[in-house]
Amino acid sequence: MPPPKKFRVQAKNYFLTYPQCSLTKDEALSQLQNLETPVNKKFIKICRELHENGEPHLHVLIQFEGKYQCTNNRFFDLVSPTRSAHFHPNIQGAKSSSDVKSYIDKDGDTAEWGEFQIDGRSARGGQQTANDSYAKALNAGDVQSALNILKEEQPKDYVLQNHNIRSNLERIFAKAPEPWVPRFPLSSFTAVPEEMQEWADDYFGSGSAARPDRPLSLIVEGDSRTGKTMWARALGPHNYLSGHLDFNGRVYSNEVEYNVIDDVAPHYLKLKHWKELLGAQKDWQSNCKYGKPVQIKGGIPAIVLCNPGEGSSYKEYLDKEENTGLRNWTLKNAIFITLTAPLYQEGTQAGQEEGH
């Protein structure tokens, strides 16, 4: 009769199952952390489940820095802190650490320690089809969750294509900017110049079908604290571009009625998208952020807000001889307004609180 086969498991990843174990997951985690092993432990994850009969059991994944050889089948036994009871596990080497981790995660009642180690040989670390992994990433709900899935299941792509993957996921999961809620109603602005009010009435007073194909834009120049920003932002759904242009999907929407361009230096706008924005041009691309081109739907006017003075005033900038051609084009595509007084009356709520 052959001698009984000696117990021996040699693996970097261990999958333990404790049937009928009354310990909490935190009690078990503490005991497993304190086990002395010749190979450093890197990650422990525990799930506590209830059988149909109500009896609890634990599933555990332990990852070591290198292969750990276990020849004592009682090594991973746990001890009850309140009574004389030992809990003995079924011990297996885990070929796919990711599969075990996914299995443990399924019920959600988990505890963990350390950082999960990606295993390139696991079914989720290279052999799983890319389509499965990317479909799972698309269903993850947010950028970071999707990245975590691809890091685990497609580590090669995650390392070599990280920038492109992150950029694509940020665009896919981008949420439309929250609608801006004006602090003051339009009725607060009782001193709007007639030509400026006519522009607003002509554009916002008609439905989208009745608006011109390329509506005129508006350039408003005036001192600080005249109410021009609050007025412009109270007219309807808009994009607010302040100081620079950013067409990232997290801050810019193609589903608004107009753009507000505030304190953007005229020489900067000339270098970027002067004619596209002020000319209400349709279907153009931008790569202002040195990333992949962003498709802009366009077809909406811009309200440009600026202060007087060198470097800020659009009128002064266009009056320069080298900008004659741009000035002639702009006069055909925008209305210029120069404010000589605030757009509100002193004593109104807007007059008391206007800060720009």
Curated annotation (Swiss-Prot):
Its EC number is 2.7.7.-, 3.1.21.-. A divalent metal cation binds at E49, H57, H59, D107. A motif (RCR-3) lies at residues 103-106. Its main location: host cell. A motif (RCR-1) lies at residues 15-18. Keywords: ATP-binding, Covalent protein-DNA linkage, DNA replication, DNA-binding, Endonuclease, Helicase, Host nucleus, Host-virus interaction, Hydrolase, Metal-binding, Multifunctional enzyme, Nuclease, Nucleotide-binding, Nucleotidyltransferase, Transferase. Divalent metal cations, possibly Mg(2+) or Mn(2+). GO terms for biological process: DNA replication. Residues 143-153 are annotated as: Binding to RBR1. One of its GO terms (molecular function) is endodeoxyribonuclease activity, producing 5'-phosphomonoesters. Gene3D superfamilies: 3.40.1310.20. The active site is at Y103 (for dna cleavage activity). It is found in: Host nucleus. It comes from the Viruses. Pfam families: Gemini_AL1, Gemini_AL1_M. GO terms for cellular component: host cell nucleus. ATP binds at E221, G222, D223, S224, R225, T226, G227, K228. Its cofactor is Mg(2+); Mn(2+). A motif (RCR-2) lies at residues 57-59. Signal peptide: none annotated. Homooligomer. Interacts with the replication enhancer protein (REn). Interacts with host retinoblastoma-related protein 1 (RBR1), and may thereby induce the transcription of host replicative enzymes even if the cell is not dividing anymore. Interacts with host PCNA. Interacts with host SCE1 protein. There are 3 rolling circle replication (RCR) motifs. RCR-2 is probably involved in metal coordination. RCR-3 is required for phosphodiester bond cleavage for initiation of RCR. Essential for the replication of viral ssDNA. The closed circular ssDNA genome is first converted to a superhelical dsDNA. Rep binds a specific region at the genome origin of replication. It introduces an endonucleolytic nick within the conserved sequence 5'-TAATATTAC-3' in the intergenic region of the genome present in all geminiviruses, thereby initiating the rolling circle replication (RCR). Following cleavage, binds covalently to the 5'-phosphate of DNA as a tyrosyl ester. The cleavage gives rise to a free 3'-OH that serves as a primer for the cellular DNA polymerase. Belongs to the geminiviridae Rep protein family. This is Replication-associated protein.
